[in-house]
Swiss-Prot record:
Location(s), subcellular: Cytoplasm
GO molecular function, one term: transferase activity
Pathway: Amino-acid biosynthesis; L-histidine biosynthesis; L-histidine from 5-phospho-alpha-D-ribose 1-diphosphate: step 1/9
Cross-referenced Pfam families: tRNA-synt_His
Keywords: Amino-acid biosynthesis, Cytoplasm, Histidine biosynthesis
Record-annotated membrane-spanning stretches: none
Origin: domain of life: Bacteria
Full protein name: ATP phosphoribosyltransferase regulatory subunit
One cellular component term from this protein's GO annotations in UniProt: cytoplasm
Task performed by this protein: Required for the first step of histidine biosynthesis. May allow the feedback regulation of ATP phosphoribosyltransferase activity by histidine.
Amino acid sequence: MTKWKRANPNGTRDYLFEECTLIEEVEQKLRRTFLERGYEEIRTPTIEFYDVFAFQSRPIDEEKMYKFFDEKGRIIVLRPDMTIPLARVVGTQRCDTPLKVTYSGNVFRANESLAGKYNEIVQSGIEVIGIDNVRAEIECVISVIQSLQKLRVQSFTIEIGQVQLYKCIVKKLSIHEEEEKFLRTYIESKNYASLSNFIRDKKLDRCDETVKLLEKLPRLFGNLEVIEEAEKLASSNEMKMAITRVKEIYEAIEKLGYGSYISIDLGTIQHLDYYTGVIFKGYIYEIGEEIVSGGRYDELIGNFGEMLPAVGLAVQVNQIVKALQEQQEPYERKRIDIMIHYELNRLAEAERLRNLLQKDGKKVALSLFSNLNDTFQFARKNQIVTVVEAKSESLVEYVWKEKWVVQKEGETSCVTFKLR
């Protein structure tokens, strides 16, 4: 029964000290940037009813959810996604729109063992709800680019894709649901050989414009030249409109001076089925991991109430932290500047002194040791060079200079002592 008591479940890990501080800083900087741009915060429970994620299209694989029962026998899940609970809130609360919201929290999704992915991650994101024009997508992309700049993330790019174009192709070529799952994988992984074999096995006419577009789809990545290629092969107004939307977003962001942070990839297809239009994926070159994901989901909120257009982007906080650790100087947690050793009957005075000293920007801590020598040893081990002793009769400041020496000694009043 105690076999696993010293281990973490698959796909989880402990975060210690500097890394915890860095995660907190990343979350706070993202939150601050989004709030400054007019987003309002929403928080949803870590646990949700299974039914929240089990509507008709089944956007999240049931096997990837952590499920258990509540006290009434109802199925509960650890939230595997942040967008769907937000859609539930907006759909059931009948919020006024347009609405810009931000969130941050942990997401739990069971990945395959040894896949190198964590099953618990931290996501911070934004959603623009109630707007169906390109201003919503543009707002989301600008917000995320600015937040990554403020975090000093280097060498990142956000790819703009269009799942609506892919869905138009699938519909026009009458590709069945089971076959489509394989097709999606071939395009996403840019597996040209398997895609070519798929077209051959399906006996699709390679002279047909839509088939040509399908075969080219994984190769359509880069800048606006990609759009020109796709437009030549678009065989319906719906396809042309889908391509034009990507073009409008790209051009608008480029004109703002953010062209170096964006690219087009019409072979990008999100694994979550609730996306209906433009989609986004962001990467950092050095780590090759996805740091941003999202897109337009105009039909999702309708599962919980009124049908509302919406678009959103999620930032993978853990991956950002990993990138910052690799790109920047090793993060050093702020050391304690002053340690206060006190006799128990001087606790109140010691705490007042701690409050006074920390107002000068110092990191000040009360000693946990009853013996002054133990406090000295702890201070040396942790590179603390100043110890203040709160004695019954006086306050004494010690400084390390190859040994502990008295720097000053004074009245019992912490205010007077600080001013000396």
